[in-house]
Protein backbone atom coordinates (compact mmCIF):
# COMPACT_ATOMS: atom_id res chain seq x y z
CA UNK A 1 0.00 0.00 0.00
CA UNK A 2 1.30 3.43 -0.87
CA UNK A 3 2.16 5.85 1.88
CA UNK A 4 -0.51 8.52 2.28
CA UNK A 5 0.64 11.67 0.51
CA UNK A 6 0.52 15.16 1.95
CA UNK A 7 -2.26 17.33 0.54
CA UNK A 8 -3.57 20.75 1.46
CA UNK A 9 -5.58 20.77 4.65
CA UNK A 10 -4.66 17.22 5.54
CA UNK A 11 -7.49 15.60 7.47
CA UNK A 12 -7.41 13.48 10.58
CA UNK A 13 -7.75 9.73 10.05
CA UNK A 14 -11.48 9.00 9.86
CA UNK A 15 -12.78 5.53 9.16
CA UNK A 16 -14.62 5.70 5.85
CA UNK A 17 -16.74 2.86 4.47
CA UNK A 18 -17.40 3.05 0.74
CA UNK A 19 -20.76 1.39 0.07
CA UNK A 20 -21.27 -0.07 -3.42
CA UNK A 21 -24.40 -1.66 -4.85
CA UNK A 22 -22.67 -4.43 -6.80
CA UNK A 23 -19.03 -5.47 -6.54
CA UNK A 24 -19.41 -8.44 -8.87
CA UNK A 25 -17.54 -8.85 -12.13
CA UNK A 26 -20.66 -7.55 -13.86
CA UNK A 27 -20.78 -4.53 -11.56
CA UNK A 28 -18.07 -2.25 -10.17
CA UNK A 29 -15.63 -5.16 -10.10
CA UNK A 30 -15.54 -5.61 -13.86
CA UNK A 31 -12.80 -3.04 -14.47
CA UNK A 32 -10.58 -3.93 -11.53
CA UNK A 33 -9.15 -0.76 -10.03
CA UNK A 34 -10.11 1.53 -12.89
CA UNK A 35 -13.59 2.64 -11.81
CA UNK A 36 -14.59 5.42 -9.44
CA UNK A 37 -15.09 3.10 -6.46
CA UNK A 38 -11.39 2.32 -6.34
CA UNK A 39 -10.25 5.79 -7.42
CA UNK A 40 -12.11 7.28 -4.45
CA UNK A 41 -10.53 4.69 -2.18
CA UNK A 42 -7.04 5.53 -3.43
CA UNK A 43 -7.63 9.26 -3.09
CA UNK A 44 -9.06 8.91 0.42
CA UNK A 45 -6.11 6.79 1.52
CA UNK A 46 -3.75 9.51 0.35
CA UNK A 47 -5.34 11.99 2.76
CA UNK A 48 -4.87 9.56 5.62
CA UNK A 49 -8.36 8.05 5.82
CA UNK A 50 -8.80 4.42 6.83
CA UNK A 51 -10.87 3.02 4.02
CA UNK A 52 -12.84 -0.17 3.47
CA UNK A 53 -15.13 -1.04 0.58
CA UNK A 54 -18.42 -2.79 1.31
CA UNK A 55 -20.95 -4.09 -1.16
CA UNK A 56 -23.16 -6.81 -2.51
CA UNK A 57 -22.30 -9.39 -5.14
CA UNK A 58 -25.15 -10.14 -7.51
CA UNK A 59 -24.62 -13.21 -9.63
CA UNK A 60 -20.93 -14.03 -9.61
CA UNK A 61 -17.64 -13.61 -7.80
CA UNK A 62 -16.44 -10.17 -6.71
CA UNK A 63 -13.98 -8.44 -8.97
CA UNK A 64 -10.47 -8.00 -7.65
CA UNK A 65 -8.94 -4.52 -7.50
CA UNK A 66 -5.51 -4.53 -9.07
CA UNK A 67 -3.96 -1.29 -7.85
CA UNK A 68 -5.25 -0.99 -4.33
CA UNK A 69 -4.98 -2.99 -1.14
CA UNK A 70 -8.14 -1.49 0.32
CA UNK A 71 -10.07 -4.27 2.11
CA UNK A 72 -13.27 -5.36 0.37
CA UNK A 73 -16.11 -6.88 2.38
CA UNK A 74 -18.89 -8.44 0.32
CA UNK A 75 -22.24 -10.06 1.00
CA UNK A 76 -24.17 -12.09 -1.60
CA UNK A 77 -26.88 -10.01 -3.20
CA UNK A 78 -30.44 -11.26 -3.25
CA UNK A 79 -33.86 -10.15 -4.42
CA UNK A 80 -36.55 -9.11 -1.94
CA UNK A 81 -37.48 -10.32 0.62
CA UNK A 82 -34.10 -12.01 1.09
CA UNK A 83 -32.31 -8.72 0.47
CA UNK A 84 -33.50 -7.42 3.84
CA UNK A 85 -31.51 -10.07 5.68
CA UNK A 86 -28.50 -9.54 3.45
CA UNK A 87 -28.63 -5.81 4.18
CA UNK A 88 -28.63 -6.41 7.92
CA UNK A 89 -25.65 -8.74 7.54
CA UNK A 90 -23.73 -6.06 5.66
CA UNK A 91 -24.63 -3.22 8.02
CA UNK A 92 -23.52 -5.25 11.03
CA UNK A 93 -20.01 -5.29 9.58
CA UNK A 94 -19.78 -1.54 9.01
CA UNK A 95 -17.31 0.24 11.24
CA UNK A 96 -17.21 3.81 10.05
CA UNK A 97 -17.24 7.46 11.01
CA UNK A 98 -18.42 8.26 7.49
CA UNK A 99 -20.28 6.14 4.95
CA UNK A 100 -19.52 7.06 1.35
CA UNK A 101 -22.57 5.80 -0.59
CA UNK A 102 -21.97 5.40 -4.31
CA UNK A 103 -25.00 6.51 -6.32
CA UNK A 104 -28.53 7.19 -5.02
CA UNK A 105 -29.75 3.60 -4.88
CA UNK A 106 -31.65 1.67 -2.20
CA UNK A 107 -28.63 -0.65 -1.95
CA UNK A 108 -26.30 2.26 -1.16
CA UNK A 109 -27.88 5.55 -0.13
CA UNK A 110 -30.93 3.80 1.30
CA UNK A 111 -28.82 1.59 3.55
CA UNK A 112 -26.48 4.46 4.44
CA UNK A 113 -29.37 6.66 5.60
CA UNK A 114 -30.81 3.76 7.60
CA UNK A 115 -27.43 3.22 9.28
CA UNK A 116 -27.14 6.96 9.95
CA UNK A 117 -30.52 6.90 11.66
CA UNK A 118 -29.40 4.05 13.93
CA UNK A 119 -25.81 5.10 14.64
CA UNK A 120 -25.47 8.81 13.91
CA UNK A 121 -22.67 8.30 11.39
CA UNK A 122 -22.31 10.85 8.60
CA UNK A 123 -23.13 10.10 4.97
CA UNK A 124 -21.48 11.34 1.80
CA UNK A 125 -23.29 10.52 -1.43
CA UNK A 126 -21.26 10.21 -4.60
CA UNK A 127 -23.06 10.42 -7.94
CA UNK A 128 -21.03 9.42 -10.97
CA UNK A 129 -23.91 8.48 -13.27
CA UNK A 130 -27.56 9.34 -13.71
CA UNK A 131 -29.08 5.93 -13.11
CA UNK A 132 -32.52 6.90 -14.41
CA UNK A 133 -31.02 7.95 -17.75
CA UNK A 134 -30.93 4.25 -18.64
CA UNK A 135 -34.70 4.04 -18.10
CA UNK A 136 -35.96 7.14 -19.87
CA UNK A 137 -34.76 9.76 -17.40
CA UNK A 138 -37.43 12.19 -16.25
CA UNK A 139 -39.91 10.52 -18.60
CA UNK A 140 -39.73 7.23 -16.69
CA UNK A 141 -43.07 6.06 -15.30
CA UNK A 142 -44.01 2.76 -13.73
CA UNK A 143 -47.60 2.16 -14.82
CA UNK A 144 -48.28 -1.57 -14.82
CA UNK A 145 -51.62 -3.26 -15.24
CA UNK A 146 -52.98 -4.98 -12.14
CA UNK A 147 -51.87 -8.32 -13.57
CA UNK A 148 -48.36 -7.02 -14.27
CA UNK A 149 -48.14 -5.43 -10.83
CA UNK A 150 -49.05 -8.74 -9.22
CA UNK A 151 -46.42 -10.54 -11.27
CA UNK A 152 -43.77 -7.92 -10.45
CA UNK A 153 -44.46 -8.33 -6.73
CA UNK A 154 -45.26 -12.01 -6.36
CA UNK A 155 -42.96 -13.82 -8.78
CA UNK A 156 -39.64 -14.92 -7.22
CA UNK A 157 -37.81 -12.82 -9.83
CA UNK A 158 -40.53 -10.23 -10.23
CA UNK A 159 -39.27 -6.82 -11.31
CA UNK A 160 -40.18 -5.09 -8.05
CA UNK A 161 -38.22 -7.66 -6.08
CA UNK A 162 -35.00 -6.29 -7.56
CA UNK A 163 -33.56 -3.92 -4.93
CA UNK A 164 -32.53 -1.26 -7.47
CA UNK A 165 -35.61 -1.29 -9.69
CA UNK A 166 -36.05 2.05 -11.55
CA UNK A 167 -39.10 2.87 -9.43
CA UNK A 168 -36.96 2.67 -6.31
CA UNK A 169 -34.21 4.69 -8.00
CA UNK A 170 -36.74 7.44 -8.62
CA UNK A 171 -37.75 7.38 -4.97
CA UNK A 172 -34.12 7.54 -3.86
CA UNK A 173 -33.47 10.64 -5.97
CA UNK A 174 -35.96 12.45 -3.73
CA UNK A 175 -33.78 11.59 -0.70
CA UNK A 176 -30.47 12.84 -2.07
CA UNK A 177 -30.78 15.95 0.10
CA UNK A 178 -30.62 13.81 3.26
CA UNK A 179 -26.92 13.09 2.73
CA UNK A 180 -24.53 15.25 4.77
CA UNK A 181 -22.47 15.96 1.65
CA UNK A 182 -22.70 15.20 -2.06
CA UNK A 183 -19.90 14.72 -4.56
CA UNK A 184 -20.33 14.46 -8.32
CA UNK A 185 -17.92 14.24 -11.21
CA UNK A 186 -19.54 16.21 -14.04
CA UNK A 187 -21.21 19.57 -14.47
CA UNK A 188 -24.40 17.86 -15.67
CA UNK A 189 -24.71 15.95 -12.40
CA UNK A 190 -23.81 19.00 -10.32
CA UNK A 191 -26.54 21.01 -12.02
CA UNK A 192 -29.05 18.24 -11.36
CA UNK A 193 -28.08 17.18 -7.84
CA UNK A 194 -25.82 19.90 -6.44
CA UNK A 195 -22.77 18.99 -4.43
CA UNK A 196 -19.02 19.35 -4.88
CA UNK A 197 -17.55 18.52 -8.25
CA UNK A 198 -14.70 16.02 -7.91
CA UNK A 199 -13.53 14.72 -11.29
CA UNK A 200 -12.06 11.26 -11.53
CA UNK A 201 -8.35 11.21 -10.80
CA UNK A 202 -5.77 9.31 -12.83
CA UNK A 203 -2.75 7.60 -11.34
CA UNK A 204 -0.24 9.63 -13.35
CA UNK A 205 2.65 7.66 -11.88
CA UNK A 206 1.24 4.42 -13.28
CA UNK A 207 0.13 6.13 -16.51
CA UNK A 208 3.55 7.65 -17.23
CA UNK A 209 4.61 7.49 -20.89
CA UNK A 210 8.30 7.47 -19.95
CA UNK A 211 7.85 4.00 -18.45
CA UNK A 212 6.55 2.30 -21.61
CA UNK A 213 7.95 1.62 -25.09
CA UNK A 214 5.33 2.23 -27.81
CA UNK A 215 7.08 -0.12 -30.24
CA UNK A 216 7.11 -2.96 -27.73
CA UNK A 217 3.41 -2.37 -27.11
CA UNK A 218 2.65 -2.52 -30.82
CA UNK A 219 4.65 -5.70 -31.22
CA UNK A 220 2.97 -7.33 -28.25
CA UNK A 221 -0.53 -6.73 -29.61
CA UNK A 222 0.13 -7.16 -33.34
CA UNK A 223 -0.26 -3.47 -34.18
CA UNK A 224 3.13 -2.74 -35.77
CA UNK A 225 1.84 -2.59 -39.35
CA UNK A 226 -0.78 0.06 -38.69
CA UNK A 227 -1.38 3.59 -37.49
CA UNK A 228 -3.56 3.14 -34.47
CA UNK A 229 -6.67 4.95 -33.29
CA UNK A 230 -7.55 3.57 -29.88
CA UNK A 231 -10.72 3.48 -27.84
CA UNK A 232 -9.65 2.04 -24.47
CA UNK A 233 -13.10 1.19 -23.14
CA UNK A 234 -16.33 -0.75 -23.58
CA UNK A 235 -18.24 0.28 -26.71
CA UNK A 236 -21.82 1.45 -26.37
CA UNK A 237 -23.93 3.35 -28.93
CA UNK A 238 -23.74 6.69 -27.09
CA UNK A 239 -19.95 6.52 -27.07
CA UNK A 240 -19.82 7.29 -30.79
CA UNK A 241 -17.62 4.44 -32.04
CA UNK A 242 -19.76 4.20 -35.17
CA UNK A 243 -18.87 7.80 -36.04
CA UNK A 244 -15.15 6.95 -36.00
CA UNK A 245 -15.74 3.84 -38.11
CA UNK A 246 -17.71 5.88 -40.64
CA UNK A 247 -14.79 8.32 -40.69
CA UNK A 248 -12.45 5.42 -41.49
CA UNK A 249 -14.77 4.42 -44.33
CA UNK A 250 -14.40 7.93 -45.72
CA UNK A 251 -10.61 7.94 -45.37
CA UNK A 252 -10.35 4.43 -46.84
CA UNK A 253 -6.73 4.17 -45.70
CA UNK A 254 -5.60 0.54 -45.29
CA UNK A 255 -2.87 1.59 -42.83
CA UNK A 256 -5.42 2.75 -40.24
CA UNK A 257 -7.06 0.61 -37.57
CA UNK A 258 -9.35 1.28 -34.61
CA UNK A 259 -8.30 -0.72 -31.55
CA UNK A 260 -11.09 -1.36 -29.04
CA UNK A 261 -9.81 -2.56 -25.68
CA UNK A 262 -12.32 -4.89 -24.06
CA UNK A 263 -15.70 -5.86 -25.43
CA UNK A 264 -19.11 -4.81 -24.23
CA UNK A 265 -19.98 -6.48 -20.91
CA UNK A 266 -23.60 -5.48 -21.42
CA UNK A 267 -24.69 -6.96 -24.77
CA UNK A 268 -23.42 -7.97 -28.23
CA UNK A 269 -22.90 -4.41 -29.49
CA UNK A 270 -19.20 -4.99 -30.10
CA UNK A 271 -20.08 -7.98 -32.29
CA UNK A 272 -22.49 -5.81 -34.26
CA UNK A 273 -19.64 -3.38 -34.90
CA UNK A 274 -17.37 -6.21 -36.01
CA UNK A 275 -19.95 -7.54 -38.46
CA UNK A 276 -20.28 -4.18 -40.20
CA UNK A 277 -16.82 -2.66 -39.83
CA UNK A 278 -14.57 -5.63 -39.12
CA UNK A 279 -12.00 -4.49 -41.70
CA UNK A 280 -11.12 -1.51 -39.49
CA UNK A 281 -11.35 -3.03 -36.01
CA UNK A 282 -8.77 -4.78 -33.88
CA UNK A 283 -10.34 -5.92 -30.63
CA UNK A 284 -8.17 -6.61 -27.60
CA UNK A 285 -9.49 -8.47 -24.55
CA UNK A 286 -10.22 -6.62 -21.31
CA UNK A 287 -7.03 -5.62 -19.53
CA UNK A 288 -6.32 -5.06 -15.83
CA UNK A 289 -5.72 -1.42 -15.04
CA UNK A 290 -2.03 -2.11 -14.39
CA UNK A 291 -1.66 -3.25 -18.02
CA UNK A 292 -3.61 -0.38 -19.58
CA UNK A 293 -0.70 2.10 -19.75
CA UNK A 294 1.31 -0.42 -21.80
CA UNK A 295 -1.67 -0.93 -24.12
CA UNK A 296 -2.30 2.80 -24.52
CA UNK A 297 1.39 3.34 -25.26
CA UNK A 298 0.83 1.66 -28.64
CA UNK A 299 -1.76 4.20 -29.81
CA UNK A 300 -1.15 7.06 -32.22
CA UNK A 301 -4.43 8.77 -31.36
CA UNK A 302 -6.91 8.24 -28.52
CA UNK A 303 -10.51 8.76 -29.67
CA UNK A 304 -13.31 9.82 -27.32
CA UNK A 305 -16.23 10.42 -29.73
CA UNK A 306 -19.12 10.73 -27.22
CA UNK A 307 -22.58 11.53 -28.54
CA UNK A 308 -24.75 14.13 -26.82
CA UNK A 309 -27.09 11.95 -24.78
CA UNK A 310 -28.06 12.11 -21.08
CA UNK A 311 -25.91 9.05 -20.40
CA UNK A 312 -22.86 10.66 -21.99
CA UNK A 313 -23.44 14.01 -20.28
CA UNK A 314 -23.57 12.32 -16.88
CA UNK A 315 -20.36 10.35 -17.28
CA UNK A 316 -16.71 11.28 -16.97
CA UNK A 317 -14.92 9.34 -19.75
CA UNK A 318 -11.99 7.65 -18.02
CA UNK A 319 -10.45 6.84 -21.39
CA UNK A 320 -9.94 10.58 -21.87
CA UNK A 321 -7.54 10.82 -18.95
CA UNK A 322 -5.92 7.51 -19.98
CA UNK A 323 -4.80 9.31 -23.11
CA UNK A 324 -4.00 12.60 -21.39
CA UNK A 325 -1.79 11.00 -18.76
CA UNK A 326 0.02 9.01 -21.45
CA UNK A 327 0.64 12.22 -23.45
CA UNK A 328 -1.27 10.96 -26.49
CA UNK A 329 -2.92 13.12 -29.14
CA UNK A 330 -6.63 13.05 -28.30
CA UNK A 331 -9.55 13.44 -30.68
CA UNK A 332 -12.81 14.01 -28.82
CA UNK A 333 -16.23 15.57 -29.23
CA UNK A 334 -17.68 18.72 -27.70
CA UNK A 335 -19.95 16.88 -25.29
CA UNK A 336 -20.46 17.46 -21.58
CA UNK A 337 -17.30 18.27 -19.63
CA UNK A 338 -14.90 17.11 -22.35
CA UNK A 339 -14.08 20.62 -23.68
CA UNK A 340 -13.37 21.84 -20.13
CA UNK A 341 -11.21 18.82 -19.33
CA UNK A 342 -9.22 18.91 -22.54
CA UNK A 343 -9.22 22.64 -23.36
CA UNK A 344 -6.40 23.33 -25.87
CA UNK A 345 -4.57 20.09 -25.12
CA UNK A 346 -6.45 18.03 -27.71
CA UNK A 347 -8.61 18.16 -30.82
CA UNK A 348 -12.37 18.72 -30.61
CA UNK A 349 -15.12 18.17 -33.17
CA UNK A 350 -18.90 18.26 -32.97
CA UNK A 351 -20.64 15.01 -31.98
CA UNK A 352 -21.95 12.61 -34.63
CA UNK A 353 -19.83 14.24 -37.35
CA UNK A 354 -17.92 11.47 -39.21
CA UNK A 355 -16.66 13.85 -41.90
CA UNK A 356 -15.17 16.22 -39.30
CA UNK A 357 -13.62 13.25 -37.50
CA UNK A 358 -12.08 12.04 -40.76
CA UNK A 359 -10.62 15.47 -41.51
CA UNK A 360 -9.19 15.78 -38.01
CA UNK A 361 -7.62 12.30 -38.13
CA UNK A 362 -5.92 13.21 -41.39
CA UNK A 363 -4.69 16.54 -39.99
CA UNK A 364 -3.26 14.93 -36.85
CA UNK A 365 -1.41 12.26 -38.81
CA UNK A 366 -0.07 14.83 -41.28
CA UNK A 367 1.13 17.08 -38.42
CA UNK A 368 2.11 14.41 -35.95
CA UNK A 369 4.95 16.29 -34.27
CA UNK A 370 2.58 19.14 -33.42
CA UNK A 371 0.04 16.60 -32.19
CA UNK A 372 2.62 15.00 -29.91
CA UNK A 373 3.42 18.39 -28.39
CA UNK A 374 -0.26 18.87 -27.71
CA UNK A 375 -0.29 15.43 -26.11
CA UNK A 376 2.51 16.52 -23.78
CA UNK A 377 0.37 19.50 -22.77
CA UNK A 378 -2.50 17.12 -22.08
CA UNK A 379 -0.35 15.14 -19.66
CA UNK A 380 0.63 18.28 -17.78
CA UNK A 381 -3.01 19.30 -17.55
CA UNK A 382 -3.92 15.83 -16.29
CA UNK A 383 -1.27 16.01 -13.56
CA UNK A 384 -2.46 19.43 -12.41
CA UNK A 385 -6.23 18.91 -12.52
CA UNK A 386 -7.15 15.24 -13.06
CA UNK A 387 -4.65 13.20 -11.05
CA UNK A 388 -5.29 11.16 -7.92
CA UNK A 389 -3.44 13.91 -6.05
CA UNK A 390 -5.83 16.57 -7.37
CA UNK A 391 -8.77 14.35 -6.44
CA UNK A 392 -7.34 13.90 -2.94
CA UNK A 393 -7.13 17.62 -2.37
CA UNK A 394 -10.80 18.12 -3.23
CA UNK A 395 -11.87 15.16 -1.09
CA UNK A 396 -9.84 16.51 1.81
CA UNK A 397 -11.98 19.65 1.84
CA UNK A 398 -15.21 17.62 1.83
CA UNK A 399 -14.11 15.34 4.68
CA UNK A 400 -12.81 18.25 6.76
CA UNK A 401 -16.10 20.11 6.38
CA UNK A 402 -17.93 17.10 7.84
CA UNK A 403 -15.46 16.76 10.69
CA UNK A 404 -15.94 20.41 11.58
CA UNK A 405 -19.74 20.33 11.34
Positions of PLM-derived features:
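Nucleotide-sugar-dependent
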Residues: 31, 239, 288-295, 302-324, ...
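N-terminal subdomain of nucleotide-sugar transferases
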Residues: 1-68, 94, 181, 246-249
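Conserved acidic donor-binding segment of nucleotide-sugar-dependent glycosyltransferases
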Residues: 346-354, 363-369
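Nucleotide-activated donor-binding/catalytic signature segment of Leloir-type glycosyltransferases, i.e.
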Residues: 270-293
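A short, well-ordered alpha-helix in the C-terminal region of glycosyltransferases
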Residues: 363, 370-385, 391, 397
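Carbohydrate-associated surface elements
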Residues: 188, 201
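Glycosyltransferase donor-sugar binding loop
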Residues: 56-59, 202, 232-236, 257-270
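Conserved donor-binding/catalytic core segment of Leloir-type glycosyltransferases
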Residues: 19, 222-239, 245-248, 259
Amino acid sequence: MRTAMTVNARVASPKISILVSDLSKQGAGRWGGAVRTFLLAQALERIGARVKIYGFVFGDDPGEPTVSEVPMITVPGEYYPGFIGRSRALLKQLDADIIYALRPKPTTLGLALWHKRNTGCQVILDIDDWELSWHGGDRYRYRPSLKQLAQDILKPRGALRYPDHPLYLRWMESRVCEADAITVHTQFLQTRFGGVKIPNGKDTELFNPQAYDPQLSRQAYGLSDYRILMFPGAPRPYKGIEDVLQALDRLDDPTLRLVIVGGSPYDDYDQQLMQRWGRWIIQLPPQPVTKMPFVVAGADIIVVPQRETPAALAQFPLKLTDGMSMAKPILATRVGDIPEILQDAGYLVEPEAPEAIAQQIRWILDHFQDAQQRGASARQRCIEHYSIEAMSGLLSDVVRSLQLS
